[in-house]
């Protein structure tokens, strides 16, 4: 199991393939992605690489993190993330990771944070149908309805789908295919959509449920 990389979402576009079919693409940019540290099983209990992306002003870095970057001999990074790896897949500290870490046609898993929607009702958050539009229903048309049973159990069970905060949650989209790679621009073109807003940071790893790198 090898490391993944951190990228920044640029936006979406579309192209036509050789069969004339329109293919939606998400563009992500890999900028100054470097190995910042190692986590080893003997000391930390697991093997991992600490990856950082996008240079950051030294004045905006805390003193403890300044020492971390100084020990690694890399410029301060905006975003850091650990990636679990197998023992034979360590990469030297300060080594750069480019878009050619992946290949066109490869399947990947993308982890990102969804766009926050604030407090949302049950119809928007959980796709409930709501109550009737008439026939005696008053001011409860978008309500979720009953939330429990009776005196026994006398409570609302944990996990009950109700209105609440929607979005801002970490999700992983599996088995997305890399359409193409632009090494000069540092771009990876991924078929389909991925969570998050423009400019948000995402992590990309080899797909764990796809053995072949081509479709």
From Swiss-Prot:
The keyword Transport does not apply. InterPro entries: Ribosomal_uL3, Ribosomal_uL3_bac/org-type, Ribosomal_uL3_CS, Transl_B-barrel_sf. It comes from the Bacteria. GO terms for cellular component: ribonucleoprotein complex; ribosome. Methylated by PrmB. GO terms for biological process: translation. Keywords: Methylation, Ribonucleoprotein, Ribosomal protein, RNA-binding, rRNA-binding. Pfam families: Ribosomal_L3. The keyword Nucleus does not apply. The modification N5-methylglutamine is found at residue 151. One of its GO terms (molecular function) is rRNA binding. Part of the 50S ribosomal subunit. Forms a cluster with proteins L14 and L19. Belongs to the universal ribosomal protein uL3 family. NCBIfam families: L3_bact. One of the primary rRNA binding proteins, it binds directly near the 3'-end of the 23S rRNA, where it nucleates assembly of the 50S subunit. This is Large ribosomal subunit protein uL3. The gene is rplC.
């Amino acid at each position: 199991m090898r490391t993944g990389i951190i990228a920044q979402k640029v936006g979406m576009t579309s192209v036509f393939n050789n069969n004339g079919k329109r293919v939606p693409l998400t563009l992500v940019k890999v900028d100054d992605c470097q190995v910042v540290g190692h986590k080893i099983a003997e000391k930390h209990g697991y093997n991992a690489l600490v990856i950082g992306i996008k240079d950051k002003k030294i004045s905006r870095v805390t003193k403890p993190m300044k020492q971390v970057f100084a020990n690694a001999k890399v410029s301060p990074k905006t975003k850091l993330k650990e990636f679990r790896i197998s023992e034979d897949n360590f990469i030297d500290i300060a080594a750069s990771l480019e878009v050619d870490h992946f290949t066109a046609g490869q399947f990947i898993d993308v982890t990102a944070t969804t766009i926050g929607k604030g407090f949302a009702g049950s119809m928007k958050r959980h796709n409930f149908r709501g109550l009737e539009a008439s026939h005696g229903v008053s001011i409860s048309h978008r309500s979720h309805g009953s939330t429990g049973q009776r005196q026994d159990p006398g409570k609302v069970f944990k996990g009950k789908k109700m209105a609440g905060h929607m979005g801002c949650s970490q999700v992983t989209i599996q088995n997305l295919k890399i359409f193409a790679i632009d090494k000069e621009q540092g771009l990876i073109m991924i078929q389909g959509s991925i969570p998050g807003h423009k400019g948000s940071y995402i992590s990309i790893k080899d797909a764990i449920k796809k053995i072949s790198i081509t479709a």
